[in-house]
Swiss-Prot record:
Its main location: cytoplasm. Residues 295-397 are annotated as: RNA-binding. A motif (Bipartite nuclear localization signal) lies at residues 1193-1227. The gene is TY2B-GR1. The lineage of its organism: Eukaryota, Fungi, Dikarya, Ascomycota, Saccharomycotina. Residues 1353-1491 form the Reverse transcriptase Ty1/copia-type domain. This is Transposon Ty2-GR1 Gag-Pol polyprotein.
Length: 1770
C-alpha cells in the first residue's frame, strides 16, 4: 500500500526527476551554484513532465540498487555495496589508505550511528525511493521521518520547506561531473555541512563526525553512479572508496584552475595598448598571464602571443602590425623591445615638442614632428637602437616603392654624411588626420588626391614632389638614399628647393627631393618648422611663430592640403628621367618604340596607364602621340589577327562583391607541338576577378599531380604576399579540373569550385579572354623578334608582366595598382628579343672574348636581373651583366623597319640601368675569378686563333663586337651551334716546333686535357718556365731522353664532339700523323671516322728528373706539380686552393723513378679479353697479354661492333654465370638450391634458456648466467615493463596483439655474462607497429668524422652506456607478451607498458625518447641529415642504441652532460677519457688507442684473434704469411656446379659466415680489403671449391694482418681549414656481364675515414663512362660529409675530388649541352656539372700510380698493393 502511494506521487521517482534537472541547466554565463529559489518551479515542472513519461517503468532508476540500506544495521558502516562500489569498496588489510583526509578515518571502521535513520540513507529502489526533498543533516541526529507522509506535505516551489532541501540531480555523464559537483556542494551546504567541505587549499573549519562522513558517502554514491565518474575520481576511490572529500577538494581546485585559465585566455585575447601606461608595465602584465598559463601546462607560442598583442595595439604602436605581418618567426622579446622603443620615442618627443605645435587635445598624440633638425633624420626599426637616437618619422601613406631600383655605389653612400631617410609605416597618421582602420596602399587612387595641392604630412622628414617644374637649383642625386617603412628603396632623381610666396608677400624656401615614384606630393612639416612655420589644424591655416597667417590649408578626405599656387615655378627645362641630360628642345620618344617595349599593347591602354602613373619614369608628355591612334603595327596585325570579337560582359554580376584575390578564374592552354622536351607544352593562367591581376605557370603535361602543384603554389603565394584567402575558383569542366584529387584539395581548404555549365564557354569569358590575349601577344612577340618557338612561354611571361602593369579600358588602375604594388619601372624593361651582349665571367682563356651574344626575354622574377637567351649555348641565363647591342634591330625586313632606329631613345630610357651595367663591367677584373649572378654550368669554350710568333695577348673587349658588320639582325629560327663569330678552327701547326695539339671542339665545347701542350697555352708556357730551375725561353727538345717523362703511353682521349686528342705512341722518333675524327657527340674513348684532320704526335716516354723543365698542358690557373687539372669555381677562396694544397698531407705513396721501359701503367683502363678468360671473381687479367696490344682497346661502334659482339656473346654464353645459383643439369637441383638459400638462418651467437641454465654442465658458467637472469628480472620489474596488477587470459586477447618472448644469454667481449628478455619481433604482426618509424643509429662515417675532428682539436672522448635503454621508452600500441615458458604461465598474458627488446618499434621509440631528452634537457641539436649525431656549442654526441660517445674540448662539459643524463637514465661511464696518456677504447667493435695531441690507432686485433679461429677455417698460424689478399690473373671457372642439396646449403651457410665477418671488419677500418670482399660476396650463391679457396685465402690474410691498424696523426696546427677529399677510381669491364668496378676513398685532413667498393649498376661502354659513374657515386656523400664537418667544426672547409681520368675532368668542365650517345651517362655528366659548380668543389687530376683508390677496383700485385696502402694502414 505504501509502495503504491509512492508510485502515484510524481516526485517519488527521484532518478527521473534528477535527470530532468540536469537537462534544465542554467545558462552558460551563469554560475550553476547560483540557482535562486525562483528557478525551482521550472525544475519541478520539468521533473514532473519527465516523471510522468516514465511512470510505466518505475523500476528504471539512475541510482544503483543497494539492498544493504533497507534497514539500520548494527555492523560498521557503510557495508560493501553492489555494482562498482561493491568491487572497489572491498579493501584488504594489506591495502594502504592513501587518503589525504586521515582525520576523517575510514567509514568501514566506524560504529553504527543513528544517521541511518536519515531519509537520505534509505534504499533508492521502487519500494523505498529517495525523497525529492531531504531534511538537512544537523549536528544532532534527526528524528525518524515518515516517508509516506513526507512527500504529501512538501511544497513545490521552495528551496527549503521546513528542514527539507533540494537534492542534487543524478550524474548523467562523465563530461558533466564538474557541473554536478557544484550542485552537490550546494546540496551539502544547504544540509548544514558547509563548514566541513574543504576549500581549494584543502583547509576545513572543523572535523566531521562519523555520522556526517557516512551521510556524505551515501549521498555521493546515490547520486553519482560509479561507471559515470571520471578516471581520476575512480583512481582515488579505488584506493579509498570512502574518500569523498578528497574528490571534492580536487574538483574545487580544478574548477578554480579552469576559471583562472579562462580568465587568462580572455585577458590575453582582449589585450589593448596605446601607450597610456608604461611599456614595462604592459610587458609585465602580458608575461605574467603567459607564465600562469604555462604553469597550467598551456604553452603559448611566441607567434600566437605576438599576434594577440599586435591585434590590440593602437595609436603610434599600430605601426608594428604591418612590420610583423609577413614575419613567420616572430619573437615576443623583439616585439616588446619595439614597443619600448616607440614608447621612449614618444616620451622624448613630447618633452622636445615646441609650443607652436600645441594643438587640440584630439590630436595631441598624433603629431611626432621633430623641429630644429638641420640634417636629414635617420629613423630605423632596429630594436637594438639606443634611446638617444632621433625620433621616428611618421608614415607617408602614398609612397610607392620601386623594388627594381638597385643601389649604386653602396660604399660611397654608406660613407657619405647624408644619412638614409626612412619613411613611416602604413598605419600612422599625418598631423591632424583622423585614424582609419583601412590600410592605405602605396599607390592611392587619384580620387583621393586634391589636384594642384601638396599633402601636408607631419611624419615625412623630407618634402617629395613628383614634378621638377617647381624645383629650383636642381642637381642630380648621387648621395641621398630614401627607403620607406618596409625598408625598400625609393629612387631619388634630383635635389633642389621649393620657393613659396605666401599671401602677405612672405617668401621662404625649403629643401625638396624629386621622385616620380609617389602618388602624392608631400610637404614635410619638419621642413616648414625649420623656417618657423607651423600648421594650425583648429583654424586650418599655416602660421608663423608670431601668429601671422600665411596661407589657408584645406581638408580633403582624411588629409590636409596646401595649394600649389603659393609655389614659384622654376625657369629651367624639365628635369630629365634617370638623370640623363637633355637638350633645351626636349626629344620625345617615338610611339612605335614605347609600343614595342610595352609588349605591343594597344594605344588606349598605354595612354591611360601613363596618366594613372602605372608606368614610372615615363610620362604622357614624353611621347610623341601624333598618329599614334592610327598607327598600325605589322607584327600586331599578323600576330593578333582574329575572326570576330570575344563575347563581352559574360561573367556574373555577383562576382563584383568579392574582395581582391578571393575569386579567381583559371584555364589551361595547350599543347604546343614540335617543341624540345625541355620546353613547356602548356600553361595554366589565373586571373583575379577584382584586380584583374594575372599569373601564368608553365606545364609539361596535364596530369593531376602537375595541376595540383600549381594550385598549391598560387594559393600559398596569394596568402603570403597579399594576406588574402581564395574563396572561389571558376574553371571549365575539363578532366584536369573535375578529378577527385583536385576536388578533395578544394574541399580540404574550404574553396568553392565553380564550374561552367556544359557547352557554355561564354560563362568562362575572363579566363578565355586572357588566354587569347596572351597568345596574341606571344605570336606577335615571337614574330617581331624572330626568336625560336621553344621560347614561346618566355613571350607569354613577358606579356603577363606588361599586362599587369597597364590600365585596362574599363579600369581606373592597373592590376598592379589594384593589388597595392608599385608601378612598372620602365627603365627595367627591354623590348622582347632585344640583342644584348652578356659578360662571360669565366671564359676558357684570358685571351678569349668576354662577351656572348644574346637576346633579352623578360625581367627575372627571382632576382634583379634579366632573363637572356644565349643561342651559342642554347640556354637562358639570369644576369645583370649585359650591354644593349647598338645598331641591331630585330624587325622583319619585309616591313622596312630599317628606317626605325631607336638606339638613342632606348639609351635614354634605360640610362639608369646602363650606367649600372657599365659600372659593373669596368669594375670587374678580367684577370680574376669573380662571382657572377648568373649560373653557367661551366666556363664557356671559345676557340682562339692559332699560335703566332708573338706570345703576348690581351683580353678582348666585348664592346668591340659593334665594329664588326653584321648582316643578320634577327636570331635564326633554328640556332646553329656555330653561331659565335669566334669559333675559329685552329690553323696548321708550325712544323718547326713539335707541339702536342690540344684542340678544342667546336661542336660541343668539351675539352680533354692531357699531359701535352696546347698552342693556345704557349704564351703562358714560356713565362711560367722562366721561374723554374733550368728553364729557358726556348721550346723544349722533346727528343731529349734525360729530361721529361710525360707519363702518356698508348693513351687516346675523345671529347664530347668526337674530336680526338693526340694519339701518343711509344716510338723512338717524334712523328706527326693525321687521323680522321668523328663529330658525333660521345663520351666514348674509342676511335671513329671523321671528315676533319687532327695532328697526332707520338712521343717516347722519358724518365722524370729533378730540376728539369717539363711540358705543362694545363692553363696557368690549373697547373700543379702533379699535372692536376682542376675545375676551379668562381669562389673568393679559390685563388688559395691549388692542387698542391689538396694533395698535401694525403697518405699517397712515394714513387721512385722508373726506367723508360717501365710498363706498369701501360694497360690502364684497357678491358682485357683473354682467349681463356673466365669469370674472374677478382677481375684479374693475364700478365702475358698486357703488352700485346699496341692500339687502343676502346670499342668503336662503327669499326669493331661485330668483333665486340662476338667476344661479348662468348663471354656471356660460356663464362658469365657467377652471380646465379648453381645450375644443375637437373632442374630439381636448381630449385632445391634456391629453396635452400631461402631457408638459411643467420649465425646464432646467443644461447637459449635451456642451453645456458637448464642443461648447462659448466656449473661456474651456469651460476653466472643465473645471476644475470635474476638481474634482468629485477631490471624489468623496476622499469615497469608490463602491467603487474593483472594477468590476462589468453583466449580473451586478439592473437595479433600477442607477442612471443624468450630469454637469450651471451657472453660479452669484456667477459661479463648477459641475460636479456626479448620479444619475438620476427613474427610480429604488421598491424601492431608503424612501418614508417625508423630505428636510427649513428652512421659509421659520422663516427669516424667525429673521431678525426677530436684528434685534430685535442678533444676529450668519453664513452657511456645506458642500461636497459629500450625500457625507458613507452609503447603506444596495445600489446601482450607470453611469459617465459619456465614461469609456468602458459595460458596467461602480460600487458606491455615499455618497449621491450626485439619489438619492431622499440628502436624507434627509444630513439624518439632519447632524442627528445637530449634536445630539451641537454640543450643539444641533432645535425641535419646525420641522425644520432647531436651537438651544442661545447659537446658532440654520437649515439648507437645505448652507447654514447661524447667529444668535447672541455672535460667538464662532458661531465655536465653525464650529470643530466643520470637524472633520467641509469648511465654507466665506460671510459671518462681524462688521462693525458694513451687511452684504450672499445667503441662499437673498434679497438681504439688515443693519445690527445698526438695520434689515434684503430684496429680489431683482440676481436679477430678470438673470432677467426672459431670459423673452422684451416688457418696456418706458423706458415708463411700472405702479403696480399689476392693476385691478378686468378679466374673462377664457370663450369656447371653439380653438388648435393644439403652440401650446397652448408657451403652457402659457411660463405655467409666468412663474408659476413670480413664485411664487418672491412667497412669498419680495413678499407683495403673491400674490393675482394665485394667480389666474393657476389659469389655466395656459387660456393665452388675455387670460391671457397679464395675466401679462405682472404680470411688467412686477415689473420696474418690482424694486428694492422688504421693510423691517424694529428693534423698540422697551422692549417686554418678543414680539407675533405674524395679519391675516385674505376676499372672498366672487369666484372661479370661486362660490368665495371668502382671505388672511392674519403679523407678528412689527410686521414682516411671511409671507403666504398661496388659494382657499377649500369654497363659502361668506355673507361670514361666508368669513371663518371664512380665520380657520381662519390660527390653526394662528399657533400653530406662536408655538411657534417661544418656542423661539428666551424672552420672553413675545402672540398676536393681526385681522379686519374682526364676525360672525366674535361666533361665536368665542358659547357657543351648536346646530347650524349648514352642518355644514362649523359644525365650523370650533366648532374656532375651542376653539383661541382654549385658546391665549390675542386676537381684535380691524380696520377694512377698515386691513386690509392686503385685498391678498391682491381686486384693488384703485392708490390703495388703495399705501396698504395702502407701510408695509411700498417
Amino acid at each position: 500500500m505504501e509502495s503504491q502511494q509512492l508510485h502515484q506521487n510524481p516526485h517519488s521517482l527521484h532518478g527521473s526527476a534528477y535527470a530532468s534537472v540536469t537537462s534544465k541547466e542554467v545558462p552558460s554565463n551563469q554560475d550553476p551554484l547560483a540557482v535562486s529559489a525562483s528557478n525551482l518551479p521550472e525544475f519541478d515542472r520539468d521533473s514532473t513532465k519527465v516523471n510522468s513519461q516514465q511512470e510505466t517503468t518505475p523500476g528504471t532508476s539512475a541510482v544503483p540498487e543497494n539492498h544493504h540500506h533497507v534497514s539500520p544495521q548494527p555492523a560498521s558502516v557503510p557495508p560493501p555495496q553492489n555494482g562498482q562500489y561493491q568491487q572497489h569498496g572491498m579493501m584488504t588489510p594489506n591495502k594502504a589508505m592513501a587518503s589525504n583526509w586521515a582525520h576523517y578515518q575510514q567509514p568501514s571502521m566506524m560504529t553504527c550511528s543513528h544517521y541511518q535513520t536519515s531519509p537520505a540513507y534509505y534504499q533508492p529502489d521502487p519500494h523505498y525511493p529517495l525523497p525529492q526533498y531531504i531534511p538537512p543533516l544537523s549536528t544532532s541526529s534527526p528524528d525518524p521521518i515518515d516517508l509516506k507522509n513526507q512527500h504529501s506535505e512538501i511544497p513545490q516551489a521552495k528551496t527549503k520547506v521546513g528542514n527539507n532541501v533540494l537534492p542534487p540531480h543524478t550524474l548523467t555523464s562523465e563530461e558533466n561531473f564538474s557541473t554536478w559537483v557544484k550542485f552537490y556542494i550546494r546540496f551539502l551546504k544547504n544540509s548544514n555541512l558547509g563548514d566541513i567541505i574543504p576549500n581549494d587549499q584543502g583547509e576545513i573549519k572543523r572535523q566531521m563526525t562519523y555520522e556526517e562522513h557516512a551521510y556524505i558517502y551515501n549521498t555521493f554514491q546515490a547520486f553519482a553512479p560509479f561507471h559515470l565518474l571520471p578516471t581520476w575520481v575512480k583512481q582515488i576511490l579505488e584506493i579509498n572508496y570512502a574518500d569523498i572529500l578528497t574528490v571534492l577538494c580536487k574538483s574545487v581546485s580544478k574548477m578554480q584552475t579552469n576559471n583562472q585559465e579562462l580568465k587568462d585566455w580572455i585577458a590575453l585575447a582582449n589585450l589593448e595598448y596605446d601607450g597610456s601606461t608604461s611599456a614595462d608595465t604592459f610587458e609585465i602584465t602580458v608575461s605574467t598571464i603567459i607564465q600562469r598559463l604555462k604553469e597550467n601546462n598551456i604553452n603559448v607560442s611566441d607567434r600566437l602571443a605576438c599576434q594577440l598583442i599586435l591585434k590590440g595595439l593602437s595609436g603610434d604602436f599600430k605601426y608594428l602590425r604591418n612590420q610583423y605581418r609577413t614575419k613567420t618567426n616572430m619573437k615576443l622579446s623583439q616585439l616588446f623591445a619595439e614597443i619600448q622603443l616607440i614608447y621612449d620615442e614618444n616620451k622624448i618627443m613630447n618633452l622636445n615638442k615646441p609650443s607652436q605645435y600645441k594643438q587640440h587635445s584630439e590630436y595631441k598624440n598624433v603629431s611626432r614632428t621633430s623641429p630644429n633638425t638641420t640634417n636629414t633624420k635617420v629613423t630605423t626599426r632596429n630594436y637594438h637602437r639606443t634611446n638617444s637616437s632621433k625620433p621616428r618619422a611618421a608614415k607617408a601613406h602614398n609612397i610607392a616603392t620601386s623594388s627594381k631600383f638597385s643601389r649604386v655605389n653602396n660604399d660611397h653612400i654608406n660613407e657619405s654624411t647624408v644619412s638614409s631617410q626612412y619613411l613611416s609605416d602604413d598605419d600612422e597618421l599625418s598631423l591632424g588626420q583622423q585614424q582609419k582602420e583601412s590600410k592605405p596602399t602605396h599607390t592611392i587612387d587619384s580620387n583621393d588626391e586634391l589636384p594642384d595641392h601638396l599633402l601636408i604630412d607631419s611624419g615625412a622628414s623630407q618634402t617629395l614632389v613628383r614634378s621638377a617644374h617647381y624645383l629650383h637649383h636642381a642637381t642630380p642625386n648621387s648621395e641621398i638614399n630614401i627607403v620607406d617603412a618596409q625598408k625598400q628603396d625609393i629612387p631619388i632623381n634630383a635635389i633642389g628647393n621649393l620657393h613659396f610666396n605666401f599671401q602677405n608677400g612672405t617668401k621662404t624656401s625649403i629643401k625638396a627631393l624629386h621622385t616620380p615614384n609617389i602618388a602624392y606630393d608631400l610637404l614635410s612639416l619638419s621642413e616648414l618648422a625649420n623656417q618657423n612655420i607651423t600648421a594650425c589644424f583648429t583654424r586650418n591655416t599655416l602660421e608663423r611663430s608670431d601668429g601671422t597667417v600665411l596661407a589657408p590649408i584645406v581638408k580633403h578626405g582624411d588629409f590636409y592640403w596646401l595649394s600649389k599656387k603659393y609655389l614659384i615655378p622654376s625657369h629651367i627645362s624639365k628635369l630629365t628621367i634617370n638623370n640623363v641630360n637633355k637638350s633645351k628642345s626636349v626629344n620625345k620618344y617615338p610611339y612605335p618604340l614605347i609600343h614595342r617595349m610595352l609588349g605591343h599593347a594597344n594605344f588606349r591602354s598605354i595612354q591611360k596607364s601613363l596618366k594613372k602613373n602605372a608606368v614610372t619614369y615615363l610620362k604622357e608628355s614624353d611621347i610623341e602621340w601624333s598618329n599614334a591612334s592610327t598607327y598600325q603595327c605589322p607584327d600586331c596585325l599578323i600576330g593578333k589577327s582574329t575572326k570576330h570579337r570575344h563575347v563581352k560582359g559574360s561573367r556574373l554580376k555577383y562576382q563584383e562583391s568579392y574582395e581582391p584575390f578571393q575569386y579567381l578564374h583559371t584555364d589551361i592552354f595547350g599543347p604546343v607541338h614540335h617543341l624540345p622536351k625541355s620546353a613547356p607544352s602548356y600553361f595554366i593562367s589565373f586571373t583575379d576577378e577584382k584586380t584583374r591581376f594575372q599569373w601564368v605557370y608553365p606545364l609539361h603535361d596535364r596530369r593531376e599531380e602537375s595541376i595540383l602543384n600549381v594550385f598549391t603554389s598560387i594559393l600559398a603565394f596569394i596568402k603570403n604576399q597579399f594576406n588574402a584567402r581564395v574563396l572561389v575558383i571558376q574553371m571549365d569542366r575539363g578532366s584536369e579540373y573535375t578529378n577527385k584529387t583536385l576536388h578533395k584539395f578544394f574541399t580540404n581548404r574550404g574553396i568553392t569550385a565553380c564550374y561552367t555549365t556544359t557547352a557554355d564557354s561564354r560563362a568562362h569569358g575572363v579566363a578565355e579572354r586572357l588566354n587569347r590575349t596572351l597568345l596574341n601577344d606571344c605570336r606577335t612577340l615571337l614574330h617581331c623578334s624572330g626568336l625560336p618557338n621553344h621560347l614561346w612561354f618566355s613571350a607569354v611571361e613577358f606579356s603577363t608582366i606588361i599586362r599587369n602593369s597597364l590600365v585596362s579600358p574599363k579600369k581606373r588602375k592597373s592590376a598592379r595598382q589594384h593589388a597595392g604594388l608599385a608601378g612598372l619601372d620602365i627603365t627595367t624593361i627591354l623590348p622582347f628579343g632585344q640583342p644584348v651582349i652578356v659578360n662571360n665571367h669565366n671564359p676558357d682563356s684570358k685571351i678569349h672574348p668576354r662577351g656572348i651574344p644574346g637576346y633579352a626575354l623578360h625581367p627575372s622574377r627571382n632576382s634583379y636581373g634579366y632573363i637572356i637567351y644565349l643561342p651559342s649555348l642554347k640556354k637562358t641565363v639570369d644576369t645583370t651583366n649585359y650591354v644593349i647591342l647598338q645598331n641591331k634591330q630585330t624587325k622583319l625586313d619585309q616591313f622596312d623597319y630599317d628606317t626605325l632606329t631607336f638606339d638613342d631613345d632606348l639609351n635614354r630610357l634605360t640610362a639608369h640601368n646602363q650606367s649600372f651595367i657599365e659600372q659593373n663591367e669596368t669594375e670587374q677584373s678580367y684577370d680574376q675569378n669573380t662571382e657572377s649572378d648568373h649560373d653557367y654550368q661551366s666556363e664557356i669554350e671559345i676557340n682562339s686563333d692559332p699560335l703566332v710568333n708573338d706570345f703576348s695577348s690581351q683580353s678582348i673587349n666585348p664592346l668591340q663586337l659593334d665594329k664588326e658588320p653584321v648582316q643578320k639582325v634577327r636570331a635564326p629560327k633554328e640556332v646553329d651551334a656555330d653561331i659565335s663569330e669566334y669559333n675559329i678552327l685552329p690553323s696548321t701547326i708550325r712544323s718547326r716546333t713539335p707541339h702536342i695539339i690540344n684542340k678544342e671542339s667546336t661542336e660541343m665545347g668539351g675539352t680533354v686535357e692531357s699531359d701535352t701542350t696546347s698552342p693556345r697555352h704557349s704564351s703562358t708556357f714560356t713565362a711560367r718556365n722562366q721561374n723554374r730551375p733550368g728553364s729557358t725561353n726556348e721550346m723544349i727538345d722533346l727528343t731529349s731522353q734525360d729530361r721529361v717523362n710525360y707519363g702518356l703511353e698508348n693513351i687516346k682521349t675523345t671529347r664530347l664532339g668526337g674530336t680526338e686528342e693526340p694519339y701518343i705512341q711509344r716510338n723512338s722518333d717524334t712523328n706527326i700523323k693525321y687521323r680522321t675524327t668523328n663529330s658525333t657527340p660521345s663520351i666514348d674513348d674509342r676511335s671513329s671516322n671523321s671528315e676533319s684532320t687532327t695532328p697526332i704526335i707520338s712521343i717516347e716516354t722519358k724518365a722524370v728528373c729533378d730540376n728539369t723543365p717539363s711540358i705543362d698542358t694545363d692553363p696557368p690557373e690549373y697547373r700543379s706539380s702533379d699535372h692536376a687539372t682542376p675545375n676551379i669555381m668562381p669562389d673568393k677562396s679559390s685563388k688559395n686552393v691549388t692542387a698542391d694544397s689538396i694533395l698535401d698531407d694525403l697518405p699517397l705513396p712515394d714513387l721512385t723513378h722508373k726506367s723508360p721501359t717501365d710498363t706498369s701503367d701501360v694497360s690502364k683502363d684497357i678491358p682485357h679479353i683473354h682467349s681463356r678468360q673466365t669469370n674472374s671473381s677478382l677481375g684479374g687479367m693475364d700478365d702475358s697479354n698486357v703488352l700485346t696490344t699496341t692500339k687502343s682497346k676502346k670499342r668503336s661502334l662503327e669499326d669493331n661492333e661485330t668483333e665486340i659482339e662476338v667476344s661479348r656473346d662468348t663471354w656471356n654464353n660460356k663464362n658469365m654465370r657467377s652471380l646465379e645459383p648453381p645450375r644443375s643439369k637437373k632442374r630439381i637441383n636448381l630449385i632445391a638450391a634456391i629453396k635452400g638459400v631461402k631457408s638459411i638462418k643467420p649465425v646464432r651467437t646467443t644461447l637459449r634458456y635451456d642451453e645456458a641454465i637448464t642443461y648447462n654442465k659448466d656449473n661456474k658458467e651456469k651460476d653466472r648466467y643465473v645471476e644475470a637472469y635474476h638481474k634482468e628480472i629485477s631490471q624489468l620489474l623496476k622499469m615497469n615493463t608490463w602491467d603487474t596488477n593483472k594477468y590476462y587470459d589468453r583466449n580473451d586477447i586478439d592473437p595479433k596483439k600477442v607477442i612471443n618472448s624468450m630469454f637469450i644469454f651471451n657472453k660479452k667481449r669484456d667477459g661479463t655474462h648477459k641475460a636479456r628478455f626479448v620479444a619475438r619481433g620476427d613474427i610480429q604482426h604488421p598491424d601492431t607497429y608503424d612501418s614508417d618509424m625508423q630505428s636510427n643509429t649513428v652512421h659509421h662515417y659520422a663516427l669516424m668524422t667525429s673521431l678525426s675532428i677530436a684528434l685534430d682539436n685535442d678533444y676529450y672522448i668519453t664513452q657511456l652506456d645506458i642500461s636497459s635503454a629500450y625500457l625507458y621508452a613507452d609503447i603506444k600500441e596495445e600489446l601482450y607478451i607470453r611469459p617465459p615458458p619456465h614461469l609456468g604461465l602458459n595460458d596467461k598474458l602480460l600487458r606491455l607498458r615499455k618497449s621491450l627488446y626485439g619489438l619492431k618499434q622499440s628502436g624507434a621509440n627509444w630513439y624518439e625518447t632519447i632524442k627528445s631528452y637530449l634536445i630539451n634537457c641537454c640543450d643539444m641539436q641533432e645535425v641535419r641529415g646525420w641522425s644520432c649525431v647531436f651537438k651544442n656549442s661545447q659537446v658532440t654526441i654520437c649515439l648507437f642504441v645505448d652507447d654514447m660517445i661524447l667529444f668535447s674540448k672541455d672535460l667538464n662539459a662532458n661531465k655536465k652532460i653525464i650529470t643530466t643524463l643520470k637524472k633520467q637514465y641509469d648511465t654507466k661511464i665506460i671510459n671518462l677519457g681524462e688521462s693525458d696518456n694513451e687511452i684504450q677504447y672499445d667503441i662499437l667493435g673498434l679497438e681504439i688507442k688515443y693519445q690527445r695531441s698526438k695520434y689515434m690507432k684503430l684496429g680489431m686485433e683482440k676481436s679477430l684473434t678470438e673470432k677467426l679461429p672459431k670459423l673452422n677455417v684451416p688457418l696456418n698460424p706458423k706458415g708463411k704469411k700472405l702479403r696480399a689478399p689476392g693476385q691478378p690473373g686468378h679466374y673462377i671457372d664457370q663450369d656447371e656446379l653439380e653438388i648435393d642439396e644439403d652440401e650446397y646449403k652448408e657451403k652457402v651457410h659457411e660463405m655467409q659466415k666468412l663474408i659476413g665477418l670480413a664485411s664487418y671488419v672491412g667497412y669498419k677500418f680495413r678499407f683495403d680489403l673491400l674490393y675482394y670482399i665485394n667480389t666474393l660476396a657476389q659469389h655466395i650463391l656459387f660456393p665452388s671449391r675455387q670460391v671457397l679457396d679464395m675466401t679462405y685465402e682472404l680470411i688467412q690474410f686477415m689473420w696474418d694482418t690482424r694486428d694492422k691498424q688504421l693510423i691517424w696523426h694529428k693534423n698540422k696546427p697551422t692549417k686554418p681549414d678543414n680539407k675533405l677529399v674524395a679519391i675516385s677510381d674505376a676499372s672498366y669491364g672487369n666484372q661479370p656481364y661486362y660490368k665495371s668496378q668502382i671505388g672511392n676513398i674519403f679523407l678528412l685532413n689527410g686521414k682516411v675515414i671511409g671507403g666504398k667498393s661496388t659494382k657499377a649498376s649500369l654497363t659502361c661502354t668506355s673507361t670514361t663512362e666508368a669513371e663518371i659513374h664512380a665520380v657520381s657515386e662519390a660527390i653526394p656523400l662528399l657533400n653530406n660529409l662536408s655538411h657534417l664537418v661544418q656542423e661539428l667544426n666551424k672552420k672553413p672547409i675545402i672540398k676536393g675530388l681526385l681522379t686519374d681520368s682526364r676525360s672525366t675532368i674535361s666533361i665536368i668542365k665542358s659547357t657543351n649541352e648536346e646530347k650524349f650517345r648514352n642518355r644514362f651517362f649523359g644525365t650523370k655528366a650533366m648532374r656532375l656539372r651542376d653539383e661541382v659548380s654549385g658546391n665549390n668543389l675542386y676537381v684535380y687530376y691524380i696520377e694512377t700510380k698515386k691513386n690509392i683508390a686503385d685498391v678498391m677496383t682491381k686486384p693488384l700485385p703485392i708490390k703495388t698493393f703495399k705501396l698504395l696502402t702502407n701510408k695509411w694502414i700498417h
